[in-house]
């Protein structure tokens, strides 16, 4: 009798475990893990609308934002694409200046501009989606994915949070004849140079923060190795296409150089393409504020990433030096003694500058893009004071 009860109990336990397993699989299919027919994880739009803003709220904030814009940017001198939204709803946007002075094209809401290092926010998102779907892990050694990668202690996480200790490819390829500047450098070439020229680390891995574009060039290679797609195609399939980001693409130096919006020095002199413009992951995404808003809004979807991964994304990792600035997994942050953490990412490449601000608590998105060099772009952080407990003042002078 005892053995029969024991057997019956075991059978019930097996049925229970199977049912739990099935329910988890169903939840994954509908929730955290969104995988397309090709086995590629895809970012899904937010299905449920966020609370609708009142007309009074929109008018109040629009007044403050528009005054800031008009005081900061001039139609005679600036090229800028600017957008402020809350709950995915646009409060104010403005577009002015030349996208291309040679052709006379102007900046419009549909005109893609180079978003520089804001590209890192999208690259890191694609990597975290691969982590969420268990295709890779944060602690996985990079040399298990990229063949001949020369630094055995570097992990995916230390690439994401800039603690790998690697040197910037822009410097070591320029030095000592390490690369022929007449030839376009590729992501694969970076690995080749690091190996053949025995490029040393700047510091031991995971001993301190060192912002380095090489980290995100390697992450782009990881995306390629894991998905079997080239980075531009992977980003389109994983993020751009499912979110309807129709004006967003990764620059292809072989076919896009004559159709992109060029960048300019502050004196309006056009800046040409150089040997570093074939590298992607750290930069080279072209987009619009409206497309980037689609991306940011989708990050509020309940199953964007699992909660634990989101927590890791928005935490600081580098506290060796005192200060309030830190870096998460693809996002910069300022951790004030009082008030909310301030999450953002700035960018600068050639004459392109960019600023992407995500006020998480308030669900506010602030985006500024410019293809004519200016530090005014980074002043957008002051707008946070209109929406929450952030120690910025709209009337502060100076540039950062």
Show where each model-derived region lies.
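Active-site-proximal loop and beta-strand segments within enzyme catalytic domains
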Residues: 43-50, 89, 98-211
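Short, well-ordered beta-strand elements
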Residues: 355-372
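Bacterial N-terminal signal peptides that target proteins for export
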Residues: 1-10
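Short, gly/Ser/Thr-rich active-site loops of penicillin-recognizing serine hydrolases
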Residues: 338-340, 374-400
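C-terminal motif of bacterial Sec signal peptides marking the signal peptidase cleavage site
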Residues: 19-21
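Bacterial signal peptide processing site
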Residues: 23-25
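Short, conserved catalytic-motif segment at the N-terminal edge
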Residues: 54-113, 135-139, 395
């Amino acid at each position: 009798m005892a053995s029969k009860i024991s057997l019956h109990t075991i059978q019930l336990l097996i049925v229970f475990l199977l049912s739990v397993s099935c329910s988890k699989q169903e939840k994954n299919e509908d929730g955290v893990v969104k995988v397309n027919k090709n086995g590629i994880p895809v970012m899904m739009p937010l299905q449920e609308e966020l609370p609708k803003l009142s007309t009074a709220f929109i008018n109040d904030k629009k007044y403050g934002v528009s005054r800031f814009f008009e005081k900061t940017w001039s139609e005679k001198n600036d090229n800028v694409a600017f957008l402020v939204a809350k709950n995915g709803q646009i409060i104010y946007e403005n577009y002015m200046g030349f996208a291309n002075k040679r052709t006379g094209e102007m900046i419009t809401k549909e005109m893609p501009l180079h978003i520089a290092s804001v590209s890192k926010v999208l690259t890191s998102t694609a990597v975290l989606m691969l982590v969420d779907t268990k295709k890779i892990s944060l602690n996985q050694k990079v040399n298990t994915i990229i063949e001949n990668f020369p630094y055995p202690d570097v992990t995916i996480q230390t690439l994401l949070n800039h603690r790998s200790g690697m040197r910037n490819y822009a410097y070591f390829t320029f030095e000592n004849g390490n690369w022929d500047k007449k030839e376009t450098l590729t992501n694969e070439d970076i690995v080749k140079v690091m190996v053949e020229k025995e490029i040393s680390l700047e510091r031991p891995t995971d001993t301190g923060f060192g912002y380095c574009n090489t980290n995100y060039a390697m992450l782009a290679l990881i995306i390629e190795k894991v998905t079997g797609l080239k980075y531009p195609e992977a980003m389109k399939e994983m993020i751009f296409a499912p979110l309807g980001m129709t004006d967003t693409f990764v620059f292809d130096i072989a076919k896009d150089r004559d159709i992109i919006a060029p960048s300019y020095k502050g004196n309006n002199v056009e800046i040409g393409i150089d040997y570093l413009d074939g590298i992607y992951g750290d930069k080279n995404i072209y987009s619009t504020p409206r497309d980037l808003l689609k991306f940011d809004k989708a990050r509020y979807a309940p199953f964007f990433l699992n909660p634990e991964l989101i927590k890791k994304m928005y935490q600081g990792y580098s506290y060796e030096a005192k200060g309030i600035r830190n870096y998460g997994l693809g996002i910069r942050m300022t951790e004030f003694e009082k008030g909310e953490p301030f999450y953002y990412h700035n960018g600068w490449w050639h004459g392109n500058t960019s600023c992407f601000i995500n006020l998480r608590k308030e669900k506010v998105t602030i985006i500024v893009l410019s293809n004519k060099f200016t530090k005014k772009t980074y002043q957008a952080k002051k707008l946070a004071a209109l929406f929450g407990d952030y120690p910025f003042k709209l009337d502060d002078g100076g540039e950062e």
